[in-house]
């Protein structure tokens, strides 16, 4: 089958995911497409995940991390400019059962040429010495498959763990939780130093050696349609957060001079549907009155600040200030 490739130069995650969908939905189906792309400082969550359950909201806010939902299932991943993403888009005929190894092996073979022994391991990972450096997922519809994967080449592993860190004892969700795995960077295993741009070039060359092809000539109409899709879906709160299934979060903290405060937060479609306070605190007014202020707001610092407004929190939790309550709701 003829192959066309797109080597994307933007690092905007909402644009890159919009481009994937546009290629999948709109470009001619008489060929296979291969894409290379990078996202800068982003968390990409799986289609069926609860965004709030997957991210460290404080780290996301402080580091300016962009959060975008993709079309395929699977777990949440952190992308920075030390990570390279690849995508195959092609027809699969009548069968929707496709082995992910088919699309992972070109990465394995490319690494072999650089002296690194990698292997496809488990359901959707590529590993080196048992450590994961590539996670893969697929979106299949109407006889067509989009297979995409990450390649952690020289990512900041501290930020990878921090951005996705959520205490599993504090949250219950109907969405699909990401499976945390031991991870590694490809660069650590290379016998000779190779920069990421050079690796990107080598991978593309190897793909084209196995599947001769040429760059796909996107038109101005194509680019305008991608931008429209980005703006209307991948850059929207409704898609990235509001699509989330229901979850219940527990935030708890003991505060000197106040006591133990527990907040049970139920989130549906990305907004608070219910909130219940429990604990051994003293209260001059019923905490349920305060809890009602939060219904309909987003479960983040901005949402909590808006919900509380100029409410005197100490009426409901003796000895507690508004900023302290917001910290509890955000961090536990």
What spans do the regions from the language model cover?
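FAD-binding core of FAD-dependent oxidoreductases
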Residues: 70-85, 126-128, 132, 137-146
């Amino acid at each position: 089958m003829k192959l066309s490739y797109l080597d994307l130069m933007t690092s905007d995650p909402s644009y890159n995911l919009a481009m994937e969908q546009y290629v999948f939905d709109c470009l001619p189906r008489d060929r296979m497409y291969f894409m290379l792309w990078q996202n800068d400082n982003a968390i990409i969550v799986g289609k069926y995940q609860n965004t709030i359950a997957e991210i460290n909201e404080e780290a996301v806010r402080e580091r300016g991390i962009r959060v975008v939902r993709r079309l395929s299932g699977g777990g949440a991943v952190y992308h920075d400019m030390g990570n390279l993403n690849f995508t195959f888009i092609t027809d699969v005929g009548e069968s929707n059962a496709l082995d992910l190894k088919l699309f992972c092996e070109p990465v394995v073979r490319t690494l072999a040429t650089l002296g690194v022994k990698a292997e496809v391991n488990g359901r959707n990972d590529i590993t080196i010495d048992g450590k994961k450096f590539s996670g893969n997922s697929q979106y299949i519809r109407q006889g067509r498959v989009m297979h995409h994967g990450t390649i952690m080449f020289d990512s900041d592993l501290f930020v990878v763990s921090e951005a996705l860190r959520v205490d599993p004892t504090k949250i219950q969700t109907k969405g699909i939780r990401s499976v945390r795995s031991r991870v590694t960077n490809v660069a650590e295993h290379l016998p000779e130093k190779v920069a990421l741009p050079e690796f990107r070039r080598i991978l593309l060359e190897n793909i084209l050696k196995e599947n001769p092809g040429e760059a796909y000539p996107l038109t101005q109409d194509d680019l305008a349609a991608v931008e429209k899709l980005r703006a209307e879906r991948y850059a929207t709160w409704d898609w990235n957060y509001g699509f989330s299934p229901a979850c219940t979060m527990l935030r708890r903290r003991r505060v000197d001079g106040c006591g133990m405060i527990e907040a049970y937060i139920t989130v549906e479609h990305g907004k608070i549907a219910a909130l219940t306070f429990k604990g051994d605190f003293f209260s001059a007014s019923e905490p349920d009155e305060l809890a009602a202020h939060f219904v309909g707001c987003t479960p983040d610092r901005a949402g909590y600040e808006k919900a509380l407004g100029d409410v005197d929190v100490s009426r409901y939790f003796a000895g507690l200030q508004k900023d302290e309550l917001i910290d509890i709701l955000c961090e536990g």
